[in-house]
């Protein structure tokens, strides 16, 4: 009986992810399609985590949206296909964006782009500001040395989904024109959760 409980506990961890480590900030993202809770890894990605939490604390994601869905079927010109959803602040608030941050590469942080990873969107290295994305499935091509971005520097992962992957998948499957969600999925609020 104890062995069965152990197997069930391990299976639950595999299905639902590890709980947030002590001291990891947790953030609740409430969208029009449901709620996603993420753990922010400020230990391994301090610059990226602080950047995201600054936007959260200033409530700049409120009224923003998940505006992009990348599926295996909507990347006809890409040899390296990924599955992510991308969100950002309300375009009317872009003048309140902070300066771009330094890219914390995954070969430095030890974090990886797995299903449920939250990471900062960027163009070139050191250009990330407010847009972030969540991996729908494992995305090793987004890590340092990966081939998705021609510069090979990867993206700055900084946390993981604790609950709400079904909401992530629902957003990814929402109607879109190409990769643009139509309409975008509104973000109602993004707040830190109190420490346990």
Q: PLM features: what roles do these ranges have?
A:
Residues 2, 17-196:
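Cyclophilin-like peptidyl-prolyl cis-trans isomerases
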């Amino acid at each position: 009986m104890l062995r069965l409980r152990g197997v069930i506990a391990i299976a639950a961890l595999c299905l639902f992810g590890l709980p947030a480590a002590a001291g990891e900030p947790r953030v609740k993202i409430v969208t029009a399609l449901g709620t996603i809770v993420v753990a922010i890894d400020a230990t391994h990605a301090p610059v990226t985590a602080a950047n995201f939490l600054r936007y959260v604390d200033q409530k700049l994601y409120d009224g923003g949206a998940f505006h992009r869905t990348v599926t295996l079927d909507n990347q006809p010109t890409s040899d390296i296909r990924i599955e992510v959803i991308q969100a950002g602040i309300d375009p009317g608030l872009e003048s309140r964006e902070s300066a771009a941050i330094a890219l914390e590469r995954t070969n430095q942080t030890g974090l990886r782009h797995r299903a449920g990873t939250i990471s900062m969107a960027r163009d070139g290295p050191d250009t990330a500001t407010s847009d972030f994305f969540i991996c729908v499935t494992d995305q090793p091509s987004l890590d340092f040395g990966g081939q998705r971005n021609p510069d090979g520097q990867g993206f700055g992962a900084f946390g993981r989904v604790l609950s709400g992957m079904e909401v992530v998948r629902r957003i990814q499957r929402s109607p879109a024109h190409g990769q643009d969600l139509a309409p975008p999925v509104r973000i109602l609020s993004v707040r830190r959760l109190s420490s346990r």
